């Protein structure tokens, strides 16, 4: 007779325990609505169940998808607390786990002489932060599936809107909605189309803030020593530890529908092979879909700078790269695989950091152009479903 075997923590019990904890966490989120008497809006599968008027959708319906989560499953972060970035070492020393360290990625914003960092580990669990810097009401938006960061001015006409997470995606990119009181009819706002795509505000643009960077905390702090950093709420701590998209980007697989649009000329991207840098040419090849790029707005079009090219140019002894032909000279300081900080003084152009497949879907070159991502779908008219 064989001896009895006991499952120990080292022998694999940790796997079962981990699975149980994950299951309990999922059940906990699922039961929050029923136990609180609030029914979640959106079934995770059908966009029509999310409570938005889709009848006037101005983009092809094929690119619209439910994320799997209901509306507001990820709660917007409103008017967050901040602290001086120079105090982060002391702040980390007082915590059981460190909040932000040198290699952690952040969204860096510089407005009216004020620098502020929004750690991506925090933005992963909120996807939008309604904030104000130097008197400017802003929405810091981050879409993890497309790794895209856009900071918008929240002033729309005579209103200041406040954004929430809709639970819907377009071209794998987060759709937001404008929150309001009883009787308010919300619109859906696309991060990478820079406008409302459905609802009463359909077609209304949101203006991106210039000079936004995505890089690591160490580089941002070095180039902006007076920066502030946004702090999490206590309820964010556990979710921040368990949320990461690194493996998704490495796999290179896009899990949601993507429709290549056909926007007006001013919203298209000039083929990257025709744009040169001061010390070298941009990649003139088919880029992998998950290549991290910086899209730079010019007067009549956009140009794209791949992060690997900026990194290549940021050689010793200075560690900086200067680019030209992008509407305005830009000086960058890059961190390999993490991003690049804009260090040239204002005014700087609008720069959108994101993954190439997403940018090319929303803002393709007029003829497909150089740099077309592998397996890119055919362009579709944005005139309606």
Q: What are the roles of these predicted feature ranges?
A:
Residues 9-385:
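Mid-to-C-terminal functional-domain signal that highlights helix-capping/loop sites
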Residues 1-11:
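N-terminal Lys/Arg-rich, disordered targeting/topogenic segments
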């Amino acid at each position: 007779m064989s001896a009895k075997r006991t499952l120990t923590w080292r022998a694999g019990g940790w796997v079962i325990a981990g699975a149980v904890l994950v299951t309990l966490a999922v059940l906990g989120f699922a039961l929050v609505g029923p136990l609180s008497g609030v029914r979640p809006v959106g079934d995770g599968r059908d966009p029509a169940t999310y409570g938005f008027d889709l009848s006037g959708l101005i983009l092809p319906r094929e690119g619209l998808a439910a994320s799997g989560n209901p509306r507001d499953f990820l709660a917007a972060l409103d008017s967050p607390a901040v602290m001086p970035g120079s105090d982060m070492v002391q702040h980390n020393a007082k915590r059981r786990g460190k909040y932000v360290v040198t290699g952690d990625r952040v969204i860096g914003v510089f407005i009216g002489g004020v620098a502020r960092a929004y750690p991506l580990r925090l933005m992963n669990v909120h996807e939008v932060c309604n904030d104000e810097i130097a008197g400017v009401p802003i929405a810091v938006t981050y879409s993890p599936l497309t790794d895209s960061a856009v900071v918008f001015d929240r002033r729309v006409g005579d209103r200041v809107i406040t954004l929430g997470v809709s639970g819907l995606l377009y071209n794998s990119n987060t759709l937001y909605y404008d929150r309001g009181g009883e009787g308010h009819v919300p619109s859906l706002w696309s991060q990478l189309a820079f406008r409302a795509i459905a609802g009463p505000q359909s077609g209304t643009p949101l203006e991106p803030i210039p000079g936004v960077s995505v890089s690591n905390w160490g580089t941002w702090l070095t180039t902006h020593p007076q920066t502030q950093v946004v702090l999490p709420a206590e309820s964010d701590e556990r979710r921040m530890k368990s949320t990461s998209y690194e493996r998704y980007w490495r796999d290179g697989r896009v899990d949601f529908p993507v429709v290549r649009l056909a926007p007006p000329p001013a919203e298209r991207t000039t083929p990257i092979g025709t744009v040169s840098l001061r010390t070298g040419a941009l990649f003139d090849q088919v880029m992998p879909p998950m290549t991290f790029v910086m899209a730079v707005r010019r007067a009549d079009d956009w140009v794209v700078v791949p992060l690997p090219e900026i990194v290549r140019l940021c050689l010793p002894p200075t560690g900086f790269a200067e680019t030209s032909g992008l509407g305005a000279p830009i000086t960058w300081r890059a961190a390999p695989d993490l991003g690049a900080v804009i260090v040239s003084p204002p005014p700087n152009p609008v720069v959108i950091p994101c993954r190439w497949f997403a940018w090319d879907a929303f803002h393709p070159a007029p003829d497909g152009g150089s740099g077309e991502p592998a397996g890119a779908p055919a362009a579709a008219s944005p005139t309606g479903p």
